[in-house]
Amino acid sequence: MSAADLAARVQARVGTVPLDAHEFRGEVTLTAPAERIVDVLAAARAVLGEPTVLTDLTAADRYPSEPRFDVVYLLTGYSPPARLRIKARLAGEAPVIASVTGLWPGADWLEREVYDLFGIRFDGHPNLVRILMPADWEGHPLRKDFSLTEEPVEFVEHVPKVPSTIIPKSPPRE
């Protein structure tokens, strides 16, 4: 299936939902409205056939541009082989998008990672809590406006640093 054909078939399934299709090196990227992302992903899954795998779900911070965030879904279909990237743009300091754990249960940890590192909330997620950073961490470290100071960070389970000792070099054996 050609890239243009793939984009046209997804567009036909979602009807009046505006999709912006872009092809680069034979791979299609569809930009969809964030409020319809679940419908667009379900249509893409139907077009790609079974099995369709959510290979990756990530985000990009485009600060200072608006809309500020891109949430990016990478789908892989195997019959016939095809890859499709679908993006949704989100604005504001507290962006929210619908969870796709209903379509792909494996999106659970991917959505938690994006939430933890970018602060993007996934509405309807069954357990949206931090997955990489400590529970008491303030902020989201992959945001471009995240403070990069040299301040010491205090963790809940702080273990005092053990002083290092320099072991003297032993004299050469004779």
What residue ranges belong to the model's regions?
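Terminal low-complexity/charged segments
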Residues: 1-174
